[in-house]
Regions:
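Short S/T/G/P-rich N-terminal loop/turn motif that feeds into the first structured element of a domain
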Residues: 1-50, 55-71, 78-106
Length: 106
């Protein structure tokens, strides 16, 4: 699995909320067997900053989405004055015993 954390700092709360809404609008498309996104978390750090964590089934799914969507999306945010930073790497997952792991396909 591959974990990707994206930090986005924007000019105002409206811009941040708009980015989050745009990403949520493509969630159902990415949360499929063919697209490989397993989990996405939004952490509202402040009115103008959001950190997002994405968990991908493997690197090939993440690269496919980056090629088709993400690179242009983040470039557009930067051109509008936002600051985007990204870190990624192999990811090891632990789950709480409160989660029924038999329902989770990883």
């Amino acid at each position: 699995m591959i974990g990707v954390t994206v930090t986005v700092k924007l000019q105002n709360k409206l811009a941040k909320d708009s980015i989050i809404m745009s990403l949520k609008n493509v969630s159902q498309y990415l949360f499929t067997e063919e697209r490989g996104l397993l989990l996405r978390c939004f952490t509202n750090v402040s009115d103008t900053q959001v950190d997002m964590f994405h968990l991908w089934k493997d690197k090939s799914y993440q690269l496919q989405t980056r090629k088709e969507f993400s690179t242009k999306f983040w470039k557009d945010i930067i051109e509008m004055g936002g600051v985007v930073s990204l870190i990624e790497g192999k990811c090891e997952v632990e789950m709480s015993s409160f989660i029924n792991s038999s329902l989770v396909k990883i």
